Amino acid sequence: MATVMKKVDAVIVGFGWTGAIMAKELTEAGLNVLALERGPMQDTYPDGNYPQVIDELTYSVRKKLFQDISKETVTIRHSVNDIALPNRQLGAFLPGNGVGGAGLHWSGVHFRVDPIELRMRSHYEERYGKSFIPKDMTIQDFGVSYEELEPFFDFAEKVFGTSGQAWTVKGQLVGQGKGGNPYAPDRSNPFPLEAQKNTVSAQLFGKAATEVGYKPYNLPSANTSGPYTNPYGAQMGPCNFCGFCSGYVCYMYSKASPNVNILPALKPLPNFELRPNAHVLRVNLDSTKTKATGVTYVDGQGREIEQPADLVILGAFQLHNVRLMLLSGIGKPYDPVSGEGVVGRNFAYQNMATIKAFFDKDTHTNNFIGA
């Protein structure tokens, strides 16, 4: 029989970026907030200690900060006629494990959403006609505009300590000839920090791209180009271009993470609690099956715990949020044959493209620098 804990105002499942942001917002609103993280407690110190963290075998090969898919994984199939098989090799998507989640091991690339992406169906129908999009394509508009989201993007960049060069600010051109992105949407403020310096290889690429007519620009990154203190009082140090970003804890406190940028502001609060090693099994519902009443989880000792709450927020990795909703009987599961249902519909992930470049033997790219 499950042990029933004292009720809280809000329980958050997962403590990555989503969980940390929601915890800060809700505690500021005066709510008693409990965050449940299925993995262990981890932080820049001591888990990111130098030189132990500069260990490619532990992090790049054995993938210490990622979900251990030998213990738990998802199944994958390419069509409804295929047999669903367990994913046994991390590749496209990289769920995190432990406090910070994927926000601890990400690289720090910090683009804003393009306004067109928020109204993709309307954009293409206006441009190419309503018959352009295939009937079986489920693409749809988000229902929120870039203009509505812009103030939140602006504040998030201040929290993250994002480095970059704006193209326009309040309609005024400020980034031409300075590495700004001519395709970026307008901004209400410049980036909190100037863009990172370009390495020799980046300079070579930029020169070559410009010569053939492209418009290279400085990547916006949540990797600080200088010392920085965010609105929550969290301090960050300048990036030293070590190259151990994606898949690693940043020992320089230069890469934004929930652990560096938000957790220090939450720890002293009397209305916040973080419980690691708390693996949520399901969201509990009332008798009408339309309202969440809390969650049930298993703690580090294997005990089943029921945590009542007025508000339940699913802030785990996308795949795990959907799985929890399916296990809890929330919403109608998506049926790819009939097209009915919402839960699990429209899963999408980022596209990545790479190129290989060959140089003559007298071209040096400063190979010893990591980033």
Predicted segments, located by residue:
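FAD cofactor-binding and catalytic pocket of flavoenzymes
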Residues: 78-106, 112-126, 133, 142-146, ...
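A short, glycine/Asx- and small/polar-enriched loop/turn
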Residues: 233, 286-293
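Conserved N-terminal glycine-rich FAD pyrophosphate-binding loop of Rossmann-like flavoproteins
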Residues: 40-65, 96-98, 102-107
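Glycine-rich loop(s) and the adjacent beta-strand/alpha-helix scaffold that form part
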Residues: 25-28, 32, 39-56, 269, ...
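Short, solvent-exposed loop/turn and secondary-structure capping segments
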Residues: 44-48, 107-109, 116-121, 228-231, ...
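Conserved redox-cofactor binding core of oxidoreductases
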Residues: 59-61, 65-73, 86-92, 117, ...
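A short, basic/flexible loop-to-alpha-helix module at the beginning of a structural domain
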Residues: 1-7
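N-terminal Rossmann-like FAD-binding beta1-loop-alpha1 element of flavoenzymes
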Residues: 8-35
